[in-house]
Amino acid sequence: MEKKQISSLELLKLTTDKGDTSYGADQKWFFGPVKQRSGCGPATAAIIFYYIDRKKEPEKPPMAFRFFRIFLERMWGIVTPTRHGIPEARMLATRIKNYASLRHYHVDVKSMEIPENPSERPHISEVFRMLFEAMDNDVPAAFLNLENTSCPDLDTWHWVTVIGIDCDNAGFARVTFLDNGSVKYFDLAHWWTQGKGAGGIVTVIPKNDRRFW
């Protein structure tokens, strides 16, 4: 059995203007219905970068809700979806690199596409390795689910933020992720073998100490 996760979920705890607790961002926090419908990619990127910064000064209070919404808008300005969202891992990775470059921040950004056709996919061990690498570096990862409906908590055509993965020898691989302010789970092995398992992964590993926001 192998279990890896980020060191502190509490660093991603935010309080909304209504006093509700949220873990990570909710894409409904964007301004305007278009952004709220298609903001999962930039919201996921914002969560990853926010966590990296929070780790540097964990004793400080979390970002105020109104400022986090501004942070999301800034992220949208660079990690901008197309009219079809951000349906490929390489697209999100490119936008993240652009954001980091504009902020003069050096990061190692990796992406992996997971095609629907089994013959075109990477081996599932490569998927585990990529997620484990992110967790080993104590950074959340971005996971894209396209048309797979086999996992009830995982929306289709949607980016989520992976914060942990727990594998056993029986083939179970529980992924812990954040989506719209909640902690959720899905079985990666089940996702891989059932339905249309197309999607992708993006990881972001920082290489210096510059703040993101």
State the predicted function of each range.
Residues E59, M63-A64, S111, P115, ...:
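A sequence-level detector of short, solvent-exposed, charge-rich linear segments
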Residues T82-C167:
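Predominantly the structural core of cysteine protease catalytic domains
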Residues M1-N98, L102:
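Active-site-adjacent structural segments surrounding the nucleophilic cysteine of cysteine proteases
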Residues A64-F65, R69, E73, R121, ...:
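Short alpha-helical interface elements
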Residues K4, S125-R129, A134-D136, N145-W213:
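Active-site signature of cysteine proteases
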